[in-house]
């Protein structure tokens, strides 16, 4: 009976749809979630340091929660569900520490997300990792042990999460790690974020040339650490200000930091081109503060941008530009196909429902000519279009603000718990009307 109830709850959550109605005026103050990227890195480093002082203000998102549960319980079978970051970071952690033998697995989608690059790299360092099913994909059986470390080469155009996973275990390797990245290096800000977080915990890790990183075999220090708010989460409020018809729109976002190492802090610059002004209450280095977003009244007629260093912002900016009627050509999207879903395909499919037909080039570029098709399948202007989210949190997060321009509904809205659990609550506190259909 309990099993049937569990299945019913899962089915019910999948079938839920939220209809989003915009507020008349956008005037709100939001306490953003803590940075998921920093939380996940800090947790792995916390565990590698001996786990005495838990970082403060950890993200409450699903991705971070599965890492916390895995590190606390260390079960024989570790299910990280849909958390790709957790899969990569925990694989490196389990392979390089003496915590016994474990199987690490996830959702069906996770079992089709490649991990061969990371496994091959760890094996070259001496790790004992076996595939339980299909070669190159989870689940993995890992027997942890101390590794010697040394020199290692990987391609620079792989996911930065593979590189970050290797870097973070560098200090516990007997010889440390010298990591050379061959070819073009994508998502460099995420690598820099990892190095910065490592140094916050006393690691000696730095670029020694344009393509080489040296990590010394120096143990992490155990110290208190406070995690700043998430710039990725902030991006959806930038989108709302950009799309709002309220000339006095004003959003206050708490806990953000000027000079943040988060790659997605580039959202400030991108939205300055789309009519949003960013004002910091304080610019004290290293201190979180409140950021105020207002309309600047200025926007570009066309936008070109390379998202190679901030791929998680792509869905937000694509949706914003379409709704604002700003033609675009976006590059650097090559990692979007191996995220929670094929994000390029998902964007094209869902935006086509709204009359926006995007062109993709070689699975790494998206273009839109600024033309919107007149829809005939929705006879009433009050009829909302239902957006499928493909088990991808950023689809729900990025499409909901389109309510400022058109009636919109979000299928399976609970996916936002992966990175921003309080999103719908925050919208309601900002006078959005959220109706469950």
Pin down the residues of each PLM region.
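Short, structured segments at the rim of ligand-binding sites
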Residues: 10-437
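Short hydrophobic targeting helices and cationic amphipathic motifs
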Residues: 4-7
């Amino acid at each position: 009976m309990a099993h049937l109830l569990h299945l019913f709850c899962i089915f019910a959550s999948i079938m839920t749809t939220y209809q989003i109605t915009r507020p008349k005026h956008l005037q709100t103050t939001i306490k953003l979630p803590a940075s998921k990227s920093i939380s996940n890195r800090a947790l792995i480093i916390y565990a590698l340091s001996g786990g005495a002082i838990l970082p403060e203000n950890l993200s409450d998102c699903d991705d971070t929660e599965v890492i916390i549960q895995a590190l606390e319980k260390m079960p024989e079978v570790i299910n990280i569900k849909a958390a790709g970051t957790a899969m990569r970071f925990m694989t490196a952690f389990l392979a390089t520490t003496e915590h016994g033998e474990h199987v690490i697995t996830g959702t069906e989608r996770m079992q089709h997300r490649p991990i061969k690059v990371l496994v091959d790299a760890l094996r070259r360092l001496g790790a004992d990792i076996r595939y339980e099913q299909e070669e190159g994909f989870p689940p993995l059986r890992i027997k942890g042990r101390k590794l010697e470390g040394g020199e290692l080469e990987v391609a620079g155009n792989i996911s930065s999460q593979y590189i970050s996973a290797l870097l973070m275990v560098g200090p516990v390797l007997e010889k440390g790690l010298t990591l050379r990245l061959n070819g073009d290096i994508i998502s460099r800000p995420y690598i820099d974020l990892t190095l910065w977080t490592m140094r916050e915990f006393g690691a000696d890790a730095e670029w020694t040339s344009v393509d080489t990183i040296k990590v010394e075999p120096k143990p992490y220090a155990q110290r208190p650490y406070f995690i700043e708010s998430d710039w990725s989460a902030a991006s959806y409020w930038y989108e709302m200000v950009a799309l709002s018809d309220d000339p006095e729109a004003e959003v206050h976002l708490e806990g953000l930091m000027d000079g943040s190492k988060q790659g997605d802090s580039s959202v400030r610059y991108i939205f300055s081109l789309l009519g949003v002004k960013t004002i910091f209450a304080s610019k004290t280095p290293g201190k979180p503060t409140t950021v105020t977003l207002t309309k600047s009244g200025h926007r570009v007629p066309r936008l070109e941008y390379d998202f190679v260093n901030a791929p998680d912002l792509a869905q937000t900016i694509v949706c914003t530009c379409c709704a604002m009627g700003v033609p675009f050509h976006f590059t650097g999207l090559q990692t979007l196909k191996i995220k929670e879903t094929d994000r390029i395909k998902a964007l094209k499919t869902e935006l086509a429902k709204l009359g926006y037909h995007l062109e993709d080039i070689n699975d790494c570029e998206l273009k839109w000519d600024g033309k919107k098709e007149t829809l005939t399948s929705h006879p009433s202007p009050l009829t909302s279009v239902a957006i499928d989210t493909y088990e991808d949190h950023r689809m729900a997060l990025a499409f909901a603000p389109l309510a400022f321009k058109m009636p919109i509904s979000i299928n399976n809205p609970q996916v936002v718990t992966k990175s921003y659990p309080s999103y719908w609550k925050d919208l309601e506190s900002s006078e959005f009307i959220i109706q469950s259909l």
